[in-house]
Each structure stands twice: as C-alpha cells, then as structure tokens.
Amino acid sequence: MKLNQLITATAAIALTASIAQAGRLVIKGSDTLGAKLVPQLAEAYKAQNPATKFEIAAEGSTTGIAAIIENTAQIGMSSRRAKATEISAASAKGIAMKPTVVAFDAMGVIVNSANPITSLTKKQVEQIFTGDVTDWSAVGGKPGKISIYTRNTSSGTYSDWKELAMKKRDYAGSAQKMAGHEQIAAEVGKNASGIGYVGLAYMKAGGIKVIGIDGVVPTAATVKNKTFPYSRPTFYYTSGDPSGEAKGFVDFTLSPKGQAICSQVGFVPVN
C-alpha cells in the first residue's frame, strides 16, 4: 500500500472510532428537524440514557447526507431524499445509505399578519416565487413590491419547494436566502410585504399568518389525507442499518413516546 493510501485509511479508521465511541451520538443535517424536534427528542432520550452525549448540528439536509458519506456523523437529518449523485458518492465509498422516515411535514406559505391575503392558488405561488409576479396587487392584495424569503441552497426545504411549488423552475433573483425556518418567519413578521415558507413546527411565530393554498391550509389532518399540496416526509439517514447509540435513538424516535414528541413539536407522526 502506498504511503498516502495508508494515511487515508488510517485517518478513516480513526474517524470511525471517533464518532462511534461509546455514549457519543453525532447528528448533523436538516434545520427542519434539527432546530426544534431532534433536540427535544435528544433531551427525552437522554433522560432514559443519561450517559449519552449528543452533538447536533442543524445546517441543512445537504450537510447531513454529506456527513454520512464522509463518516462524520452517525445520523444525517434530511427533509429531502438523497440525490442520485449522493447515493453514488456513498456507494463509491462502500456506504449503503439507509433512509428512515421519522415524521411528515408540510411547507406552509406565510405572509405578514397585516397582509389582507388569506389564500393563493398553486399557480399564484409559483408565479410569486419564480418572479413572474412581483406586486401584491396582481394576486388580490394591496399594491406593493413582494419580498420573497427562502431557505438557502444547502437546505432540503429549498429543493423540495422548487419541486413541489415551482415546477422545478428557478427562484426569483430577488429572493433572499435564510439559514433556517425561524429566520424566514422573523423576516416575514417584520416586513408587511414579505412572503416565505416554513414547516409546521414554525407556523406559530409572531407577526405572521399561514395562508391557504386553493383554500386548503396546512394541518396534521390535511397532511394525512394528502389534500395539502406541499407535504413531504422527513428522514434520518444512516450508513446501512443503524447500530449502537444511533439504533437506540432511531428506535426511540419511532416509538410511541418519540412520535408523541414529534406531534407536540408540530410534525405529523408516521404511525
């Protein structure tokens, strides 16, 4: 074996040992899951397993899937499915990524609470976020330039929204990219002309209101019966079947207690 290959192999072994050390669970990825839900699940899990030490980094679904490929986390949180390129990259390293659906979510359209708009059509949503429509008066609102707030490009929500609401078209050039759902809600809450999208767990922020899509609002019921158009599963990704602390946490998330926490936070349980 060449020296550089030996160094790489040794580093990989050391990294594997580092993240898998007893009692340590590294979880990276989706802000949708990692900003609220997973920390609460971790707190409840730790109450039953006090020796467990969590490291949670919620920086976007892309980072969670990359962490599994790069072996820097035992669980990758994601609000989207892994792309074919990511699956291939994992396979090239001998990793068979396994997705586990842990809860369902909806991406609701939010506007400032002072905005008189109460509902938009799917076509109007597409037109707004792609920049075809730039003034509220074009969709029944008061005259004024529309300010668009979206997630950033590392976010699974960013790509899911393009697919579900924009027919895979590009975002308007004026769209302002935010690091998380809470930031989108905060900006829309401060801007009377603002519009954005957030997950179910973030829809009760101050200064905003959730509007209907063709008259249907996002709720647990409309997610379950699939009448709300912008719904999606959320995932934990692991390298093959989870083991050790990762298995314990995945199992806990899917247990009745874990799913009850999902519901309390605002997600729709899988069971």
Positions of predicted regions on the chain:
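Bacterial N-terminal signal peptides that target proteins for export
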Residues: M1-T8
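Exported/periplasmic ABC-transporter solute-binding proteins
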Residues: A22-N271
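A periodicity- and composition-biased signal for non-globular, repetitive helical segments
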Residues: T8-A11, G34
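Hydrophobic h-region of N-terminal signal peptides that target proteins for export
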Residues: A11-A20
